[in-house]
Structures are given as C-alpha cells and as structure tokens.
Curated annotation (Swiss-Prot):
GO molecular function: ATP binding; dTMP kinase activity
Organism: Albidiferax ferrireducens (strain ATCC BAA-621 / DSM 15236 / T118)
Reaction catalyzed: dTMP + ATP = dTDP + ADP
UniProt superkingdom: Bacteria
Keywords, comma-separated and alphabetical: ATP-binding, Kinase, Nucleotide biosynthesis, Nucleotide-binding, Transferase
Name of the protein in question: Thymidylate kinase
Residues involved in ATP binding: 12-19
Family: Belongs to the thymidylate kinase family.
A GO biological-process term: dUDP biosynthetic process
HAMAP family: Thymidylate_kinase (MF_00165)
EC number: 2.7.4.9
Function: Phosphorylation of dTMP to form dTDP in both de novo and salvage pathways of dTTP synthesis.
Listed GO CC annotations: cytosol
C-alpha cells in the first residue's frame, strides 16, 4: 500500500526564521519513518536554481520577474515535486506560490489577475482530476512585523535585492500573505514568529499534528 504524499510549504517575509523549523520538521517526519524531500522556491531543480539567481539578483520589471518565477515553478513541479508526492514523500518547500502573490503581487504591484492566470496554467497537473491546481496541503506562514524582520536582517550576510528592500515593501508583502490566507484559511497555519525559537517550533509542530500527519 502506497503512503500518500504530503506537500507543506513555508512562507514569511525575509527574516521570519523559516529555515530552522523546516529542518526540524524534516527530522520529525523521518523519525516516524517518512521519506522527506526538502526543496525551495525559486529553485529545487538545476534549471530552476539558475532562474533563482536571476530573480534574486538581476534588475527587471515585475512581469519579467513573475514569468521567471512561474517558469521555475513549472520545472520544479514536473521534475521534483510531483514525482516525490507520487512516491509518497513528505515534500517540505521553502516558499511556493503564496510568495509570488506576496512579493511580486503585493510587494512589487504586479497584476494579481495575471498571477492567478499563471497559477492556474502552470500548476495544473495532467492526469489528475479536471481543473486540479497543485497547491500545498498545508502552508505554514511565519507572521512577523516588517520592522522586526528589518532588524533581524540588518548586518546579516550580503542581502539579495529583496532583502535589501525598505520596511514599507515588507509591510506590503505581509499584507499580501494575509490576503492569501484570508482567501483560503483552511490551508494556512499562521505562526507568530516573534517568539522564542522553541515556542515557534511548538506552534509549527502542533499545526502539523492537527492534520494527523505526526503523532
């Protein structure tokens, strides 16, 4: 009997502290015998990683940026995510489409209707039920005030073009995440990221346990 795959994404503005908890959750799933695929967006495949470098570092308009992100996502889905889910893996992805709506949409002001069209087109999966659009089974959103995120990023490693944006940009991005959660609340677990690391981890763990995926 094949174990059903699970797709979990992790979202939040830069500085929210996702990475530590992604690794911890991977360990928790593996401890219960599950195969785990760790990945990220943009990226996850050789082609998508090349596009990631362009998106994070090169100057371009919002449309070019969005198209590159969705091109990377299509390759990521076809080459990595869908095969992993078909094997029954737990796929843990650092950012997915919600980030595109938050960063390119709310942050950069790109047309949300076009993003919705790209989401439907790029994330439709052949062979599954009609009109199926691949999105995570659970999205863990690390909600952090923009000003606190800016403090965390100050003096860190050399920032990419998004990390170097002003606080107001991250306020818009946070609003974009809130709008996505409001549109699909059952998919989201909102985590207060301005807590101790252990408190944040407990909230993440409880969100996954509530779905019956960990004991």
């Amino acid at each position: 009997m094949t174990t059903e795959g699970i797709f979990i994404s992790f979202e939040g503005i830069d500085g929210a502290g996702k990475s530590t908890h992604i690794d911890a959750l991977a360990q928790a799933f593996r401890a219960q015998g599950r195969a785990v695929t760790l990945t990220r967006e943009p990226g996850g495949t050789p082609l998508a990683e090349k596009l990631r470098v362009l998106v994070l570092n090169d100057a371009m308009d919002a449309m070019t940026e969005a198209l590159l992100v969705f091109a990377a996502r299509r390759d990521h889905l076809q080459q990595l995510i869908e095969p992993a889910l078909a094997r029954g893996d737990v796929v843990l992805c650092d950012r997915f489409t919600d980030a595109t709506f938050a960063y390119q949409g709310a942050g950069r002001g790109f047309d949300l209707k076009i993003l919705s069209f790209l989401e439907r087109t790029v994330q439709s999966i052949q062979g599954l039920e009609p009109d199926f659009i691949r999105n995570p089974d659970l999205t863990v959103w690390f909600d952090l005030a923009a000003a606190i995120a800016a403090q965390r990023l100050a003096g860190a490693r050399s920032p990419d073009k998004f990390e170097a944006q002003p606080v107001e940009f991250f306020r818009r991005v946070s609003d974009g995440y809130l709008n996505r959660m409001t549109a699909c609340p059952s998919r989201f677990a909102r985590i207060e990221a301005n807590q101790t690391r252990e408190a944040v981890w407990q909230d993440v763990l409880h969100a996954v346990q509530a779905r019956g995926w960990l004991t």
